[in-house]
Amino acid sequence: THCVVFENPNGASFEQTGGIFQKPEGQAFLQDLFTVAEDGLEGGGTPILNFGEADFNKNPYLMLINVRVSDAKRYSQLFSDFMNSSDLPGSATMFQDTFTGEYKRTHYIAISGPSVDSLRETTSASLSSQDGENFQRRAANIRKITSTYLMFHVKSWNE
């Protein structure tokens, strides 16, 4: 019924928002929030492909892409070929959805980077390349993007 939304004019402003939650007041807010809130992006998946360095200390900013795929084996091959030709600043992991709060999602892709701007620029450059255009053309009949999100880690159960 509710969500927390920040509007940011640029990538640097988005990145500064994360600092709010590192302060004691931000941590207290999150603790209170978790007593009355239910996650909207609830779900879980099994990682099936990984590319690059998945170090969230170096690459704390995430792009999440939810997709519905009709031929998982074919899409995985197309995605692998595309990722092998891309120059990622961080990592990309494709997950097969195990249970979901996202309507009709079968897979999701998490791409990490050192900044929001680097994520956006690298993704744009990769998709605009010849390999990116080939990937998009070949994947068009078997994959539908259902939603995308820009996120940053506030807390991790591993810490």
Would you name each region that the model predicts?
Residues 1-159:
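Short S/T/G/P-rich N-terminal loop/turn motif that feeds into the first structured element of a domain
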